[in-house]
Amino acid sequence: MENFHHRPFKGGFGVGRVPTSLYYSLSDFSLSAISIFPTHYDQPYLNEAPSWYKYSLESGLVCLYLYLIYRWITRSFTVKQTVGSEFSGLRKAHGILLWLLSILFLGMTAFMFVNDAFPTAFSDPPVKICLLAYSVHLFLLHSLRMIYPRARPTLYHAAVLLNLLLLPPIFHFYSYPFFFVDHPPLSSYSPFLWFYFFITIVGNFIPLFTPRVWYPLFPEDNYQPSAEQVCSMFNFACSYGYLNPLVLTAKRRVVEVDDTPVIPDYDKNKAWTYRFERMKTPSLFITIHKIFWRQILGMGVSSFMVSVCQFLSPIALNRLLKHLESPSSSSVNPLVWIVLLLTGPFLTSLFTQFYLFMSTRYLARSYTTLVQQIYNKVIRSRFVQNKSGDSKVGRSNNLISTDVDDIGEIREFIHIIVRAPVEIAGSIYLLQKLLGWSAYVGLALTVLTCSVPIVLGPLVAKLTLRANRATDSRIELMSELLQSIRITKFFGWELPMLDRVKQRRQVELNRTWKLLLMEICIQVLVESLPVFSMFATFVVFTTIMGQTITPSIAFTSISLFSFIRTQFSWIAYLMRQIVQIFVSIGRVSDFLNDPDEVDPVNTIEDTSQEIGFFNASLTWVSNPSPGDFCLRDLNIVFPRNKLSIVIGPTGSGKSSLISALLGELSLNKGSYNLPRSKGVSYVSQVPWLRNATIRDNILFDYPYIEERYKKVIQACGLLTDLQSFVASDLTEIGEKGVTLSGGQKQRIALARAVYSPTSIVLMDDVFSALDIHTSNWIYKHCFQSSLMENRTVILVTHNVHLFMDSAAFIVTVKNGSAFPVTDKSSPLLFLAEQAASASEAAAPDLAAIPIPNEVDDAEAADEKDGKLVEEEQRVTGDVVFSEIFSYMKHFGSGFYVAAVLLFFVTTQATSILIDLWVAFWTNSSVNSPDVNNNKFLFVYGTMLLAYSLLDFLRTVSYDRGAWWASRKLHDSMLESVFGTFASWFDKTPTGRIVNRFAKDIRSIDMNLSGWLFFSINCFLSVAGGILSVSSAMPIFMIPAVIVCLAGYYFGLLYTRAQVGVKRLISIYTSPIFSLLGESIVGVSVIRAFNRQTIFKQMFSERLDNLVRLQSTSYNLNRWVAVRTDGISGLVGAIAGLIALLQKDLSPGVVGFSLNQAVIFSSSVLLFVRSCNSLQAEMNSYERVLEYSKLPQEPAPTIAGQVPATWPKEGDIVFNHVSVSYSAAGPTILKDVNLHINPSEKVAVVGRTGSGKSTLGLTLLRFTHRISGEIYINGRETQSVNLNALRQRISFIPQDPILFSGTVRSNLDPFDELEDNFLNEALKTSGASSMIMAHTDDQKPIHITLDTHVASEGSNFSQGQKQVLALARAIVRRSKIIILDECTASVDDAMDQKIQKTLREAFGDATMLCIAHRLKTIVDYDKVMVLDKGVLVEYGPPAVLYHNNGHFRRMCDGSGITFLPPETRGSKSA
């Protein structure tokens, strides 16, 4: 027989002779290495092989020795300790089995050595000795592992390595000859050798199924291993079998968090945060690559292998079609190509899954690292009064919800670097082998294609940046409006605010559509040009070169051109992604590198250090402008362990002084000092409370000491309040303490500062929201108690009289300057005291009241339901097609949706017809050499042009419909949220709502429509593949149905698990945003208490919970992929086998069928994956729909309209009114009867919880009316449209809210009034006389209409905000005014001025004032006294005083007296 080594290899990919020395050469990419395969077992090549085997075995032994020496030097035998798991028994059993196999292998090798029974390839003595040495080493390693426990892992790894080195030569020896038609019979191998081969294979596969040993990364955490860490390598890297329990659980019931595998310790947040801090560089891009280089390297290697394996299928297709065209000329067994059609997709899938596994691991790790760094930056940053930081709440939310996800997509950068060049270059090389120089024609057009996204890249970057800015703007506005939703509802501003959000949403959508159109044009162009490149190549090949196009050439070329088209499509997509990635990296990097941070605190103990300022000047911003407020030339030293008070007029800088001492201001010159070694506690002017229980807010993560806790509760006057709560101190208070009154919030914040074991306590006007009784109680039982002994207390207050005797040091602040008052007889103090509230209050001795059981015993309170915030609802069950059609209905009319679907069908049908036409053309070329190629080329080109046009129309019509759907869904949810009851916001954290408008809307905008598009395409590809192949090979329907059923089964299991996990991800994302927003608002308090580490840990734990679910979600994708890939990979092989056995099929039909079979097999997995991703993204659609169907406040009706002049006068009547906050809630106001005459000034007084605020809310219809009627100007309020009612009543809350913008936009947010009127309102309220800052020459800068307002008015003092709220009420010119202690935070001089303004500006208006300071309402027309929801007294204050009732006792406690009225009597209720 002819020597096969010098036999020409004839085919599409190899030309010439191949030397025998070339063995598996990667340089011959076209598998010409097959030419070295011998046709018989006894070919000379096998006799030349022993040296190759010998060197391999000897090299393996050397590597093994080096490995063992390295492990010994690194003390692996003595330091490492393994941790047991539930698989320990299985691990031991596998170890014993491997030991037995090593004995058997040694015995068989020794037997062959003695009896000279080695095969020819192993008969050389050196090789025999090496193999025997290997057997001895294997036996020794397994034996040592049985008796030497500390070294077991190292020895085990060495044995596995040794086993693995044996497999290639032995496997090659047995499989080598069967690659050829004339292979030797199986009987030529003895059973002994087959058994030898078998135990070699088993010895290598057992380690794959052996559970692994776990080494804890953080032994101190007492952390249990994740299933991912102890399962076998096969379950970990191949089958993902450790997720089987989760998948089976999801089949039976709804998935819970505890059903998912715990997060591995190497993926915990603290591990990656530590690495980031250690490897941090100024460039975030470089830092990311330094930290995650292993994942990036793994992605690069696996991506390269995917590219290489991709070519196995087209090579096999070419050779199989070549065999069918000329069976006699083929020497290679055609079953080899069938096997290659199976192994090609299998290997591609294996490396693809490994690539995806590494990339999703990078995704999860980069997410947890960057999000934690953003939060850490938030904790360090200055937010208050920073103009550049107005939007930091929304900006931080957007960085986490958008930019961090975009940075995670940097993994796709590997695609352009590795995979695209390899596949494009490989395809061009193989096309050149197939089509000669005509392939370079296509290459030229391909280069042109490549330039399109590069040229348009800057434009895409610009459009992307503009769209992102629009998204930021919308999210920032939404965050601000949701933070102040109650003031919006108080004023009836829902509809105008809706319009503002919708305008920003429209800008965002317009910019997004421009970007989308650009992407569509690039995508269609990039996908179409490779197709026309293929057309041009065929034209040159057939007409100019005069070659005949055969099925093996045509369909292989189509596959290769599809590779090029796919890669350039990816390039077009990734060019936009890369632009977005670098934009996001820049945004996150700018945020993290922002130098505006507070100074690190000094915790060094130094008792000699003084507390105060030393020639210090400070501002809120790092680079102040002339108009910015400044504390100037401060020289103040506060005495240690004494009480100091800070006084001054409203807006003078008192709160800034305290913030400066805490390090919240930027130091421009001088120095300041606040020792932190023994801790600092701080009570802000606006109390900051966490969304937690009362007890958690007071403890603030300090240990619970029962005795001290009881004393603090008693000292802060909280006993009565706790008795009124259902679960006492275990009652949840909601976001920002929304369920509490202003006084209750202030006292809880005070209790937190008093309970903490700190030596320094800073308090900012803690008495502003307290009534006289409570103020005096706290002064007596808190400030003068043992709780405050040996503590340095610095208190900002207007109650000078209360602390005059006990204060050791007094500081006066005026216009940013401060100086001490050394003489208590100073005229300044005299004036302050005269202006202060009248006198101390004699309160009942609450000390005699025992602390109730709820405070004594936490267990008793646990039995009661103190929960306020409802858990986020989860939609359960599978997402059905009705929901998908429900989403598509938002595209437009039914006709429009039908037209879009028709474009999908016709585009897919055209694609199939193109391949069918190629089959018809190539068959004609084979049967008739003189075929008219021009006719076929013309039809072929026309079809390609039609396909490109249909593709464009399909994409544009679909994306436009999705754009409309996004707009409608956003607006529907927006209107629903703004139209729901105010009580819903008490139960729903703002972060949860923001998450719906940020992450879920983004999902609908970007992901949902894309996955639906992809799912429809995949479905049509599957259906088209089945119909196409079955039409030529009907028997193919059987395996196709089996594959579809198997795909459906695995897809069903997978989808139920994945959708459940995705829904959990959505739920566990909201707490991250909630804690972020909560921390930004209270960051100064967190820093003052030095609780940054605790809050970082809380955030880290929430991140770990989220990453646990995200990793499970990613790995579930791998779970289904390996199963569906394994099944669908059989399809191509089965189709090839059918074609081989079915002799009557022409090569063209076979090529068409195999091409469609490959498309079908790949589309099955893609369809399962896309359906899952679609269902997961539909979760966002469900969540948006959920918030679009919230219970709504009554909608406006024609009957509810009122004249523009209504009410002409403020006549108010309550007729037997009883209300509650919900239909099932307790009655708050009980049978209230009263009549308020027009223009009367009525004060509402009573103890905390008596129902004062509820009365005002009832007038605005914020409560549930149980019975009775309320009339305003003779009209029942229930019959008036809600927005009209609230717009005609002005409400001035205790905690005023300002919106970002200017003073003008806050007074007149809808530009309806002239500046003259607005300036008059500023002047009347006194706001225009307030000083914001000073210029460099000390000239004051007053508040004007153009004064900048930061988010929530953070650049104004609390008193200034209350005055601006008064100005806003003046602008509204309402006939009814409700004031809820609106002067609590102003000094008494300003209070008196405001009271005068109220009487003058609202002389003809009816005023309802909820008051704590009795002196401010002594000249009111009437007073109503509420007690536990009952109106107990109502009448003129002098009359009530002399009735000796509730009001008299309150006046006596305040030192207020009234002269006897000339006429007694009152209009009783």
Curated annotation (Swiss-Prot):
Broad class of enzyme this protein falls into: translocase
Major subcellular site: membrane
Observed effect of gene inactivation: Cells lacking both abc2 and abc4 show sensitivity to cycloheximide (CHX) and 4-nitroquinoline oxide (4-NQO), and decreased accumulation of monochlorobimane-glutathione (MCIB-GS).
Domain ABC transporter: residue ranges: 611-840, 1214-1453
Entry EC no(s): 7.6.2.2
Name of the featured protein: ATP-binding cassette transporter abc4
Glycosylation site residues: N386, N510, N615, N691, N790, N815, N923, N1007, N1355
Organism superkingdom: Eukaryota
Record-linked Pfam families: ABC_membrane, ABC_tran
Domain ABC transmembrane type-1: 296-580, 897-1176
SMART domains the record matches: AAA
Binding sites annotated in the UniProt record for ATP 1: G648, P649, T650, G651, S652, G653, K654, S655
Catalytic reaction list: ATP + H2O + xenobioticSide 1 = ADP + phosphate + xenobioticSide 2
Keyword field contains Ion transport: no
Cellular component aspect of the GO annotation: fungal-type vacuole; membrane; vacuolar membrane
Lineage of the organism: Eukaryota, Fungi, Dikarya, Ascomycota, Taphrinomycotina
Family: Belongs to the ABC transporter superfamily. ABCC family. Conjugate transporter (TC 3.A.1.208) subfamily.
Record's keyword terms, sorted: ATP-binding, Detoxification, Glycoprotein, Membrane, Nucleotide-binding, Repeat, Translocase, Transmembrane, Transmembrane helix, Transport, Vacuole
Its biological purpose: Involved in detoxification of xenobiotics, and vacuolar sequestration of glutathione S-conjugates. Together with abc2, required for accumulation of a red pigment (ade pigment) in the vacuole of a mutant affected in the adenine biosynthetic pathway.
Binding positions (ATP 2): G1246, R1247, T1248, G1249, S1250, G1251, K1252, S1253
InterPro entries, per database record: AAA+_ATPase, ABC1_TM_dom, ABC1_TM_sf, ABC_transporter-like_ATP-bd, ABC_transporter-like_CS, ABC_transporter_C-like, P-loop_NTPase
Subcellular location: Vacuole membrane
Topology term for the membrane: Multi-pass membrane protein
MF terms in GO: ABC-type xenobiotic transporter activity; ATP binding; ATP hydrolysis activity; ATPase-coupled transmembrane transporter activity
Spans through the membrane: 21-40, 55-74, 94-114, 121-141, 160-180, 189-209, 296-316, 337-357, 412-432, 441-461, 524-544, 553-573, 894-914, 936-956, 1009-1029, 1033-1053, 1065-1085, 1120-1140, 1148-1168
